[in-house]
Amino acid sequence: MAQRIKQINKWTGSILICTAFLLIIGACNNQSELSESMLEKGVSKELADWRKENLSHLYYQLFFSIPENRKEAVTGSVTIQVDKAEDVPLVIDFRADKKQILSISVNGKKKPEYQFINEHIILPSQILKDGKNEIHIDFIAGNQSLNRNDEFLYTLLVPDRARTLFPCFDQPNLKAEYTLALEIPQSWTAVSNTLVYSDLPKNDKRVIQFMPTEPLSTYLFSFVAAQFQKETRTNNGRTISAYHRETDLKKLNQLSTIFHQVFSALDWLEEYTDIPYPFAKYDFVILPGFQYGGMEH
């Protein structure tokens, strides 16, 4: 009899293990075809194609708090609005340590179920809605693409480094509209892809809010914050500003020539392509020790 009970207990344990295994498999199946290669580090072509097919109408609302001491972390938040297809999860890229994810909410619900695997935040379909979803993530920004100096900071997100800075869908063919707010030291100013909407004091800092961008790929999103000098010129109704930290008078005297070349280049491009300049503004930033001769953002 004791032997019989022992055998029944063994079978029961096996059934429970099998049931648990089936539940795990079922949960995986609900993730709608997420293959192993799709969850590799980086963004595989398979993942990029799958997201392009299943996601649309992307919008990022971003905030970064930039301390004056470059040894202190840059903290941030992102609210992602995205339409998704029926019964599919979301795979959001974030090349950082899991401890840099401070909090997540999904459609207003805090502390949702999620996984963090190989630089991907995976939100299961069960906690999402078919159609429009809103994801809010508080995080510590990665430093890899934050080029920080004691008196300035600039992002450089090419070719695939946006995900080192903030959680996003880091592939060029998922363009999105961005709004950005920066909390920076009072003596600094900031430049981004679009015009400034507001600039307000906040204790010993200032908060600069920028207008929404046109649809952009993640690698083109950019901002610079520094103790800048600003020079502005207008030509044929077009106004351009230059931001710099130069004190050498000989170099500063070259600004007029630089402005002339920029205005001429834009006029030539419009004439050659027969396409008006499509963005809200054009500015340029001159930085010491920049890695490349120039970079468009």
For the regions a language model picked out, list residue spans one by one.
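N-terminal secretory signal peptides that target proteins for export/translocation
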Residues: M1-K10
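Bacterial N-terminal signal peptides
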Residues: S14-I24
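N-terminal, polar/Ser/Thr-rich
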Residues: A27-T75, N147-E151, P172
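Beta-strand-rich interaction surfaces with strong enrichment in secreted/lumenal proteins
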Residues: F64-S65, I80, K111-P112, L123-I127, ...
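Hydrophobic helix-coil surface modules that form long, contiguous segments used
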Residues: G76, Q171-H297
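Surface-exposed beta-strand/loop patches in extracellular or lumenal glycoproteins
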Residues: Q81-K98, D170, Y178-P185
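A surface-exposed beta-strand-loop module
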Residues: R95-L153, D204
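Surface-exposed, acidic/Ser/Thr-rich flexible loop segments
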Residues: Q126-W188
